[in-house]
C-alpha cells in the first residue's frame, strides 16, 4: 500500500511539473506573438424559394431538379427579390445590434466558375443591408472544471447575396459534374473584424451565432448540409504592431474543425516567423484526416471582381423610423424589432439563477442541445431547470450514445422526453426506471412513458413502512454482513443497498432506503 502511494504521488508530481513547463512555454509564446482572426460566415436563409427566383430550396432533391430559368442564367430572365429573405436579414441584423441601412444596393461581382452560370454573383458590397454590429459570447477554457470569460466581436457588415451551384468531381469518369440546385439560394454573409485571438474564441463565436440564427428561425445552421459555411482569416504579428500577412482557411466542416484549423495555422505561422521566414498570402484548406492545413492556391494579385451596380434591381428601401407613417408599404423595421424573441444571452442570464455554472456550460456546449433544453422548459413552467439538465445530460444522452443515436432522435420524440422528466420530478419513478424507459423509447417509440410504467408496475416504492420491512428482511437474512459492518467494514454498506435494489427490481426510493438502512444498522 505504501509503495502504491509513493508511485501515485510521483505520478502526480511528474504531471504537475510537466503541466507547469508547458504553461510557461505556452504563455511566453503568446506574449511574443499576437494572433488576429477574422471570420467570414455564409448562412443560407431558411426560405421556401430562392433569393431572386421562385426555384425551391430543398436540400435532398435530385441533382438539377430545383433550378429555375433564372438560376441557370437563361438570357432574358430577370431577378425578382424575395421579400422573406430581406425580412430574415433585417431580423438577424437587429438581433446582432447592427445599424440597418435605410437604402441598400445590389451589385454584380464578376468571376468565372463553372458552377456560376451567369459569370457574376449578385451581392451587396459597397452599400450592404446592415453595418456595425456586435456579438457577445462566452469562451470556455478547456479543462475538467470549465472556466469561462466573456468576449465580443465586431461585425463589419451583413449583406444579402445568392449562392453558387456545386461542382461534383467524379474521379472514375475523370470529369467534373455541375449541380445547380444550390445556385440562387439566399445567403447572409457576416463579415467580422479581425478581433479574435484563438480557435476557441472563433468556435465559441460561431456556436453563439448558430444559437441566435436557430432561435430566430432564419437559418438551420446545418454545417453538414452546407447551410453554414465558415472561412477564417488568420495572421500573426508582434503585440502593438500592424496586422501580419494573412492566410485564408477554407473547407472547414464543423465548429470543432474550425478550432483545430485555426490553432494549427497559428502554430504554423509562428514557426515560420521564428525561423526567420515570411508568411505567404494564400488560401489553405483544413485536412480533417491529417489534422493540418494544406495549400489550395496562392493569392499573388488581388482579384478584380469589377463590381458594378445590378442594373435589373432597384435600390432596396426600408422603413426604419418608428413613429413615421409607412406610406409606400416598405418592409417595416420597427415592427420586425418587436418580433424578436428572447436571445441566448438573456436566456443564459435567466438560467444562471437556476443552474450551476458547470451545468450551464454543459447545456450551452451544443446548439441543438441548448434549443431542445429551452423548449422543454418553455413547454412546462413547473419544471426544475437544474434537475432537467442533469437528468437529460447524465441519463438520456448516455442511452442515446449507447444506441448510436444523436439529438435529432430526442427532438423528434420531445413529448416522450418531457413526460419522462415530469414523471421523475413528480417522484412517480426513479432514475434506474428512467433509464429503462429511454431504452424502451428506442425499441417501441409509439408508447408513452406513463403507459409503460402502468403496464410494468414500475412505480417508485416510497412508502416508508414497506421499505422498512424490505430493509429488515435484508439485515435478518445476512447476519454475517451485519457482523462485518459493525466490526468497522463500512464498505459492506453498499451491498445492503444493492440487495434492496434487487429485491424491489430497481423501483425503490434509494434515498429513503439509505436513511432506513442507516437507522436500522445503528
Regions of interest found by a model, annotated:
Residues 490-522:
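Short, amphipathic C-terminal "tail helix"
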Residues 26-342, 348, 354-358, 379-385, ...:
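Basic, nucleic-acid-interacting segments
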Residues 382-388, 396-410, 419, 423-424, ...:
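M16/insulysin-pitrilysin zinc metalloprotease superfamily fold
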Residues 407-418, 428-503:
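Strongly charged, low-complexity linkers/loops
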Residues 359, 372, 384-392, 416, ...:
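Residue-level detector of well-ordered alpha-helical segments, enriched
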Amino acid at each position: 500500500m505504501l509503495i502504491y502511494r509513493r508511485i501515485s504521488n510521483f505520478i502526480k508530481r511528474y504531471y504537475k511539473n510537466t503541466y507547469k513547463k508547458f504553461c510557461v512555454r505556452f504563455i511566453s509564446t503568446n506574449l511574443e506573438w499576437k494572433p488576429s482572426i477574422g471570420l467570414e460566415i455564409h448562412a443560407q436563409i431558411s426560405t421556401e424559394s430562392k433569393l431572386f427566383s421562385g426555384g425551391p430550396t430543398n436540400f435532398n432533391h435530385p441533382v438539377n431538379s430545383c433550378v429555375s430559368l433564372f438560376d441557370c442564367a437563361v438570357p432574358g430572365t430577370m431577378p425578382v427579390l424575395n421579400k422573406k429573405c430581406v425580412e430574415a436579414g433585417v431580423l438577424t441584423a437587429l438581433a446582432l445590434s447592427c445599424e440597418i441601412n435605410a437604402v441598400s444596393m445590389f451589385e454584380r461581382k464578376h468571376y468565372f466558375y463553372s458552377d456560376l452560370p451567369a459569370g457574376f454573383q449578385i451581392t451587396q458590397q459597397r452599400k450592404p443591408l446592415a453595418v456595425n454590429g456586435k456579438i457577445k459570447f462566452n469562451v470556455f477554457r478547456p479543462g475538467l472544471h470549465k472556466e469561462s470569460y466573456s468576449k465580443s466581436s465586431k461585425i463589419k457588415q451583413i449583406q444579402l447575396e445568392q449562392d453558387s451551384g456545386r461542382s461534383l468531381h467524379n474521379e472514375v469518369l475523370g470529369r467534373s459534374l455541375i449541380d445547380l440546385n444550390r445556385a440562387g439560394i439566399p445567403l447572409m454573409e457576416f463579415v467580422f473584424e479581425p478581433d479574435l485571438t484563438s480557435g476557441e474564441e472563433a468556435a465559441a463565436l460561431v456556436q453563439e451565432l448558430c444559437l441566435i440564427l436557430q432561435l430566430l428561425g432564419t437559418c438551420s445552421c446545418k454545417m453538414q448540409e452546407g447551410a453554414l459555411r465558415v472561412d477564417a482569416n488568420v495572421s500573426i504579428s508582434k503585440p502593438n504592431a500592424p496586422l501580419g500577412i494573412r492566410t485564408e482557411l477554407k473547407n472547414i466542416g464543423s465548429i470543432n474543425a474550425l478550432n483545430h484549423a485555426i490553432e494549427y495555422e497559428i502554430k504554423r505561422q509562428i514557426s515560420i516567423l521564428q525561423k526567420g521566414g515570411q508568411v505567404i498570402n494564400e488560401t489553405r484548406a483544413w485536412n480533417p484526416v491529417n489534422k493540418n492545413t494544406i495549400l489550395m492556391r496562392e493569392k499573388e494579385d488581388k482579384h478584380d471582381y469589377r463590381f458594378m451596380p445590378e442594373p435589373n434591381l432597384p435600390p432596396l428601401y426600408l422603413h426604419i423610423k418608428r413613429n413615421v407613417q409607412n406610406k409606400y408599404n416598405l418592409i417595416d423595421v420597427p415592427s420586425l424589432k418587436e418580433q424578436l424573441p428572447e436571445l441566448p444571452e438573456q436566456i443564459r442570464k435567466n438560467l444562471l439563477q437556476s443552474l450551476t455554472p458547470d451545468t450551464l456550460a454543459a447545456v450551452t456546449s451544443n446548439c441543438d442541445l441548448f434549443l431542445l433544453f429551452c423548449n422543454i422548459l418553455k413547454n412546462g413552467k413547473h419544471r426544475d431547470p437544474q434537475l432537467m439538465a442533469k437528468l437529460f445530460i447524465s441519463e438520456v444522452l448516455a442511452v442515446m450514445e449507447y444506441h448510436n443515436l444523436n439529438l435529432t432522435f430526442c427532438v423528434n420524440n420531445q413529448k416522450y422526453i418531457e413526460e419522462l422528466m415530469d414523471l421523475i420530478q413528480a417522484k412517480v419513478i426513479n432514475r434506474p426506471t428512467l433509464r429503462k424507459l429511454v431504452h424502451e423509447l428506442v425499441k417501441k417509440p409509439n408508447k408513452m412513458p406513463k403507459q409503460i410504467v402502468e403496464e410494468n408496475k414500475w412505480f417508485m416504492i416510497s412508502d416508508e413502512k414497506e421499505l422498512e420491512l424490505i430493509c429488515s428482511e435484508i439485515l435478518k437474512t445476512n447476519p454475517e454482513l451485519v457482523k462485518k459492518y459493525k466490526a468497522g467494514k463500512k464498505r459492506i454498506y453498499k451491498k445492503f443497498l444493492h440487495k434492496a435494489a434487487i429485491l424491489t427490481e430497481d423501483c425503490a426510493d434509494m434515498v429513503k432506503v439509505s436513511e432506513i438502512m442507516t437507522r436500522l444498522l445503528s
